[in-house]
Regions:
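A short helix-loop-beta-strand connector motif used in the catalytic cores of GNAT acetyltransferases and
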Residues: 24-45, 66, 111, 210
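Conserved acetyl-CoA binding element of GNAT-fold acetyltransferases
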Residues: 58-74
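Conserved acetyl-CoA-binding loop-helix of GNAT-fold acetyltransferases
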Residues: 72, 78-93
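Conserved GNAT acetyl-CoA-binding A-motif
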Residues: 91-111
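Conserved catalytic-core motifs of GNAT/GCN5-like acyltransferases
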Residues: 104, 120-137
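C-terminal "cap" of GNAT-fold acetyltransferases
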Residues: 131-155
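Local sequence-structure signature of Cys/Sec-based thiol-disulfide redox active-site neighborhoods
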Residues: 155-189
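Thioredoxin-like thiol-disulfide oxidoreductase module
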Residues: 195-211
Length: 211
């Protein structure tokens, strides 16, 4: 992976350090069954997924595969790459005896998350919605399987700290480190807003995060 690109942020020089942190995160997660699959082009056409039990997401979905990031951009849209990547994840889930796929999306379109409308057209169903804009979708292979759910820690979207801005992040996204440590810091300083930054360093911390 040292010589391969990972799609996101590869042309954004200011995110170079964040990009390398994501690569390190990926290498560690491969040992947990994580999969990163992309088109063999210098393009943003890829899917990431792994066992939901090992996902850095506050979701309870035993025996599902969790799609973490799924993106097809630019001229590669409309060419069937998204369906092919999704089908590869479905086939992996079947081969592993999984009950299905699960993912978190914006209830309304968030530019940094999967396209809920497209996923629903591919057979995903909305399982749960949070009041502050996130939805849990599932594509069941086993119709009798229990529904996945958000962990109770995220039900309100609130954290213990009530002053200013509190941000939680991991190295799962190659944009996170730069924009949290630079863009967000700059904005809050300019506006005189208190800022607390919490980097989630373990899977357990991420699974029990308040958002």
């Amino acid at each position: 992976i040292e010589k391969e690109h990972i799609c996101c942020a590869f042309s954004d020089k200011k995110c170079k350090d964040s990009y390398e942190l994501k690569k390190t995160w990926l290498k560690n997660e491969f040992e947990n069954g994580y999969v990163f699959r992309r088109l063999d082009e210098r393009a943003k056409v890829f899917i990431e997924y792994g066992p939901a039990e090992k996902a850095w997401v506050p979701v309870n979905a035993p025996n599902y595969l969790m799609i973490n990031c799924f993106w097809v951009s630019g001229k590669y849209k409309g060419c069937g790459h998204g369906k092919a990547l999704l089908q590869s994840a479905v086939e992996d889930a079947k081969a592993q005896g999984r009950d299905g796929l699960v993912t978190v999306v914006g209830t309304s379109k968030f530019h940094f998350m999967g396209d809920a409308k497209w996923l629903l057209r591919q057979g995903f169903e909305t399982i749960e919605k949070l009041p502050y804009g996130f939805s849990l979708l599932a594509l069941k292979i086993n119709p009798a399987a229990p529904d996945p759910s958000f962990n109770g820690t995220v039900s309100s979207g609130e954290c213990e700290e009530k002053e200013g801005v509190v941000v939680y992040y991991t190295h799962r996204c190659p944009f996170a480190e730069f924009h949290v440590r630079n863009s967000l810091v700059g904005v809050t300083e300019n506006k005189g807003i208190p800022l607390k930054i919490v980097r989630l360093e373990t899977m357990a911390q991420a699974q029990n995060a308040p958002t």
